[in-house]
Amino acid sequence: MFYKIAQKFMFQMDPELAHNLAIGSLKSTGNSPLNCFYAQNIKPAPVTMMGLTFPNPVGLAAGMDKDGECIDAFHAMGFGHIEVGTVTPRPQPGNDKPRCFRLKPAKAIINRMGFNNKGVDNLVENLKAVKTNAMVGVNIGKNKDTPVEQGKDDYLICMDKVYPYAAYIAVNISSPNTPGLRSLQYGDLLDDLLGSLKQKQKELAEKHGKYVPIALKIAPDLSSEEIEKIAEALIKSEFDAAIATNTTLTRDGVSGLLNANEAGGLSGKPLNSLSTIVIKQLADCLKGKLPIIGVGGINAAEDALDKLDAGAEMVQIFSGFIYQGPKLIKDIVEAYRIK
């Protein structure tokens, strides 16, 4: 009820302004009695994946809390895990505004944010300040001005810094809003990146005395052959998981709507079936050797169950969470428990 009132007010505003306002209020109330406005008591429905046990299978996708400012607040809502980021080695402003657009009739969003974040050192301070036992994944990326050929170095810098504080690390090579980034999903660049990250993980596990799993986040705009090659590379490098999928450059299901022609990645309801298809194809190629976190267009509990049926072990929500509110977390966990 409270969310519907807040949403009505927020949806009158520019999407990015509304987002910043929400993050600000969650940041200030996460550990106060005021979190009663959004806190939920969700009965555990544990999932073991990547050697970790999550309290339930519903996570918050990266991009909502880029700088890890509201981890305790999202934990209070009942998320089984919270993926913060995407974070880069150095702070960067992202692309020019406006860069985020609602497509309300389609329950969709188009964004071209461009990895705006306050940098990895700032994120680390926020991770150190977390007061709850939230499971936090950290999504890492490269700075816009780092050449793609040297992109690997940015991922290694971020991995080194967040490793002691992350439950897992997600490697984002699939945002459509950083020029050239998606080229890291192919061939030698991919093999080199995965191999280097895996080597770094071994060194860091020894140094810190703990193993932090690494997952690769992929795009939905891939051919069957490309998905197969990525799966082979993941198996070969012994990565711990895949996250499928990021936003899409396609505009299926939104053509003719206000803002549909804006550049950027489309998320929300229209992405649901495409991302589920990619999960199914990826699962078929991985043959159970790596688990999958399914994300993209989940707007109701049934959408989440479809992704689990397609081969995902857990799910994440973002746009559906904006349109439906915290109740969506509870709905999915309840449906999962019944299933």
Curated annotation (Swiss-Prot):
Membrane topology, as annotated: Peripheral membrane protein
Catalytic activity, EC: 1.3.5.2
At the top level, the lineage of the source is Bacteria
The subcellular localization recorded is: Cell membrane
* Major subcellular site: membrane
Alphabetized, the UniProt keywords read: Cell membrane, Flavoprotein, FMN, Membrane, Oxidoreductase, Pyrimidine biosynthesis
What job does this protein perform?
A: Catalyzes the conversion of dihydroorotate to orotate with quinone as electron acceptor.
Subunit structure of this entry?
Answer: Monomer.
Q: Which family does it belong to?
A: Belongs to the dihydroorotate dehydrogenase family. Type 2 subfamily.
What protein name is recorded for this chain? Dihydroorotate dehydrogenase (quinone)
What organism, scientifically named, is this protein from? Answer: Shewanella halifaxensis (strain HAW-EB4)
Q: What is the lineage of its organism?
A: Bacteria, Pseudomonadati, Pseudomonadota, Gammaproteobacteria, Alteromonadales
